[in-house]
Amino acid sequence: MSGQGKRLMVMAGGTGGHVFPGLAVAHHLMAQGWQVRWLGTADRMEADLVPKHGIEIDFIRISGLRGKGIKALIAAPLRIFNAWRQARAIMKAYKPDVVLGMGGYVSGPGGLAAWSLGIPVVLHEQNGIAGLTNKWLAKIATKVMQAFPGAFPNAEVVGNPVRTDVLALPLPQQRLAGREGPVRVLVVGGSQGARILNQTMPQVAAKLGDSVTIWHQSGKGSQQSVEQAYAEAGQPQHKVTEFIDDMAAAYAWADVVVCRSGALTVSEIAAAGLPALFVPFQHKDRQQYWNALPLEKAGAAKIIEQSQLSVDAVANTLAGWSRETLLTMAERARAASIPDATERVANEVSRAARA
């Protein structure tokens, strides 16, 4: 499907969970001849990341309202109006055929600006429960898509765009069948780490002894303290790294993952075909719980909520999974994934631009 001469504006910012799926769709459409620009904010990660991908970015001034004081709430309508006006001026100059909202505060004024100019608005919700911005924009959007069922009652489920190196991993049967020795446990806390996993897993390692080998991604600034915790637990042999640059290689190594359940993490684990023990971040919307639930229902994962988390709960769960069980769970995870999510989102963008 040629997009020669077509123009897309991607609206996404704040966190990798919004930005990385947007980049995947942008690259897919650029390969078809589309021109792509980005709408973001100058003080969040998209400001540095997006230009590195060869995409020009325009900035508006906007931030979240949740948890702000009364003065900020009183000033909010004016701030939103100013952000809408900035976005509208940018879009009048660029003249996109369609805009794609991937979430983050920037999507709100950006989506309203596009709608006010008669530009089709396509939305993608990455999480199992819809964010406030997307809930508002869904009322004016041309097309609404969701990664997991339940965020919107009638939206099409298309999955989350996932990195191609993860999609290229061999299937679980090829990767895991015939593996012997200690079960390989990958612990992932995200770029900031997960303090609860950093505190719990060294003691889990002590309980499980030589039945497991652990690769623990501790997050920024935590490597030394986590290594020390493993050593104090009598388990200095396990590998601790601050970051994992090549997640596809880590997934290929692992037999099972212990991690938070951010939207992209859940989608990547399903695409890789891996069993998981999810410990959702305690958010008032229980967003990460809803992200993980489809894989638990599919028999591919177990959720332990943070309030229920203990060394025994994790150790007993991992000890109870034989290699045969892990392979079955891995195959169920892969079956529950949507490997062509990027193409599905890109196709809807193309369709909206032609409408």
From Swiss-Prot:
Write down the EC number.
Answer: 2.4.1.227
Keywords noted in UniProt: Cell cycle, Cell division, Cell inner membrane, Cell membrane, Cell shape, Cell wall biogenesis/degradation, Glycosyltransferase, Membrane, Peptidoglycan synthesis, Transferase
What Gene3D superfamilies does its record include?
A: Glycogen Phosphorylase B
Which enzyme type, at the first EC level? transferase
Q: In the record, what terms sit under GO molecular function?
A: UDP-N-acetyl-D-glucosamine:N-acetylmuramoyl-L-alanyl-D-glutamyl-meso-2,6-diaminopimelyl-D-alanyl-D-alanine-diphosphoundecaprenol 4-beta-N-acetylglucosaminlytransferase activity; undecaprenyldiphospho-muramoylpentapeptide beta-N-acetylglucosaminyltransferase activity
Please tell me where this protein is predominantly located: membrane
Copy the pathway line from the protein's UniProt record: Cell wall biogenesis; peptidoglycan biosynthesis
Q: Does the keyword Cell inner membrane apply?
A: yes
Q: Which GO terms describe its biological process?
A: carbohydrate metabolic process; cell division; cell wall organization; lipid glycosylation; peptidoglycan biosynthetic process; regulation of cell shape
Specify whether Cell cycle is a keyword of the entry: yes
| CDD domains xref list | GT28_MurG
Query: Can you cite an annotated GO cellular component?
Result: plasma membrane
Q: Matching InterPro entries, A to Z? A: GlcNAc_MurG, Glyco_trans_28_C, GlycoTrans_28_N
Q: Which SUPFAM superfamilies match?
A: UDP-Glycosyltransferase/glycogen phosphorylase
Q: Subcellular location, in the record's words?
A: Cell inner membrane
Stated membrane topology is: Peripheral membrane protein
Q: Which residues bind UDP-N-acetyl-alpha-D-glucosamine?
A: 15-17, 127, 163, 191, 244, 263-268, 288
Which reaction does this enzyme catalyse, per its entry? di-trans,octa-cis-undecaprenyl diphospho-N-acetyl-alpha-D-muramoyl-L-alanyl-D-glutamyl-meso-2,6-diaminopimeloyl-D-alanyl-D-alanine + UDP-N-acetyl-alpha-D-glucosamine = di-trans,octa-cis-undecaprenyl diphospho-[N-acetyl-alpha-D-glucosaminyl-(1->4)]-N-acetyl-alpha-D-muramoyl-L-alanyl-D-glutamyl-meso-2,6-diaminopimeloyl-D-alanyl-D-alanine + UDP + H(+)
Family matches, as PANTHER family: GLYCOSYLTRANSFERASE, UDP-N-ACETYLGLUCOSAMINE--N-ACETYLMURAMYL-(PENTAPEPTIDE) PYROPHOSPHORYL-UNDECAPRENOL N-ACETYLGLUCOSAMINE TRANSFERASE 1
Function as written in the Swiss-Prot or TrEMBL entry? Cell wall formation. Catalyzes the transfer of a GlcNAc subunit on undecaprenyl-pyrophosphoryl-MurNAc-pentapeptide (lipid intermediate I) to form undecaprenyl-pyrophosphoryl-MurNAc-(pentapeptide)GlcNAc (lipid intermediate II).
Family the entry assigns? Belongs to the glycosyltransferase 28 family. MurG subfamily.
- What NCBIfam families has UniProt attached to this entry? murG
In Swiss-Prot or TrEMBL terms, this protein is called UDP-N-acetylglucosamine--N-acetylmuramyl-(pentapeptide) pyrophosphoryl-undecaprenol N-acetylglucosamine transferase
The scientific name of the source species is: Escherichia coli O6:H1 (strain CFT073 / ATCC 700928 / UPEC)
Upper lineage ranks?
Bacteria, Pseudomonadati, Pseudomonadota, Gammaproteobacteria, Enterobacterales
Q: Which gene encodes it?
A: murG
